[in-house]
């Protein structure tokens, strides 16, 4: 069995007529944490959204564990292929309770299975467990992010896509989230993530892929890259000029890239 979980082969994808991924080819290994790096607009979040079926593949192929999933929709990717996606920002139903948000996260499983799995998820997030009857909007930023991750874990995903998990969180909560991701990978889950705190993320990641203008420019072991004295110049602002989408239409929002 191949150790390659995710494979992009000359993928072109984007928003409307504006292509962000330009014949992108990359691979991510099974049971590893692969970190996507690059300046704003390089295509990091676009990779996740394309893989999760939220953006149309204009050309090229995407394979998961050797199976061509090009063109599959998000529901099929979630239910049939075991891909879960935790997007950037807060994506909860604020007026609903923690318990109700978890129930909705498991809607494709059926309530019996969902209720059986919720205690398993809550065991990973004791602070969230204490707030089961609270509205999601009343949770702290860290608790909300933990709830989002927990909701994804209800599905016992084979592949977890996570976009900027540290935004708005305290260093202590970020450390907890990174520790959980490391545990999941060690247990066999493939994690593909985008993260602004490059150095912290590299410390717990296995591999790193750098993008520029929707193309792969580097794929290295995370520990090797962490030791590179040029890391800050390369990935914390300065070395590359990224593509900038048009100012009109949905692609104008910086958060989508």
For each feature predicted by the language model, list its residue ranges.
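Conserved ABC ATPase signature
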Residues: 135-139, 143
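ABC-type ATPase nucleotide-binding domains, specifically the catalytic core motifs of the NBD
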Residues: 16, 34, 56, 96-116, ...
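The feature captures the beta-strand-to-loop junction immediately N-terminal to the Walker
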Residues: 37-39
């Amino acid at each position: 069995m191949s150790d390659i979980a995710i494979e992009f082969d000359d993928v072109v994808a984007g928003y409307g007529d504006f292509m962000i991924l330009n014949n992108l080819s990359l691979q991510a290994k099974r049971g590893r944490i692969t970190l996507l790096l690059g300046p704003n607009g390089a295509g990091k979040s676009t990779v996740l959204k394309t893989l999760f079926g939220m953006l149309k593949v204009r050309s090229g192929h995407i394979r998961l564990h050797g199976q061509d999933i090009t063109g599959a929709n998000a529901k099929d990717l979630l239910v049939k292929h075991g891909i879960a996606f935790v997007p950037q920002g807060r994506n909860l139903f604020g007026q609903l309770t923690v318990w109700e948000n978890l129930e909705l996260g498991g809607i494709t499983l059926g309530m019996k299975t969902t209720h059986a799995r919720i205690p398993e998820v809550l065991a990973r997030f004791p602070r969230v467990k204490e707030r089961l009857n609270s509205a999601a909007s009343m949770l702290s930023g860290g608790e909300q992010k933990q709830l989002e991750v927990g909701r994804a874990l209800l599905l016992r995903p084979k592949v977890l896509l996570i976009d900027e998990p540290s935004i708005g969180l305290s260093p202590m909560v970020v450390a907890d989230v990174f520790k959980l991701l490391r545990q999941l990978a060690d247990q066999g889950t493939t994690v593909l993530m985008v993260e602004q705190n490059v150095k912290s993320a590299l410390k717990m990641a296995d591999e790193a892929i750098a993008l520029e203008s929707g193309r792969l420019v580097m794929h290295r072991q995370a520990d090797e890259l962490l030791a590179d004295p040029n890391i800050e110049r390369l990935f914390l602002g300065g070395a590359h000029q990224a593509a900038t989408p048009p100012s009109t239409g949905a692609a104008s929002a910086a958060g989508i890239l």
